[in-house]
């Protein structure tokens, strides 16, 4: 079995994990209502997805 030879310091561990942070999600613009929404999801303001009405939104 693989066993670490020496202990890694907290600084070295944190430097290694510096790229593990969650990235901010880029927004896409809805073609129907021009609102910003999360890509690959239904627009929350109008209910359209890829140019088609998928969900009826109550206003």
Curated annotation (Swiss-Prot):
Q: What is this protein called?
A: Large ribosomal subunit protein bL32
GO molecular function annotations of the record: structural constituent of ribosome
Arranged from A to Z, the UniProt key words for this protein are: Ribonucleoprotein, Ribosomal protein
Which InterPro entries does the record cross-reference, listed alphabetically? Ribosomal_bL32, Ribosomal_bL32_bact, Ribosomal_zn-bd
Task: State which gene encodes it.
Answer: rpmF
Q: Single GO cellular component annotation?
A: large ribosomal subunit
Annotated spans, Disordered: 1-20
Which family, according to the similarity comment? Answer: Belongs to the bacterial ribosomal protein bL32 family.
Q: Which GO terms describe its biological process?
A: translation
- Taxonomically, which superkingdom? Bacteria
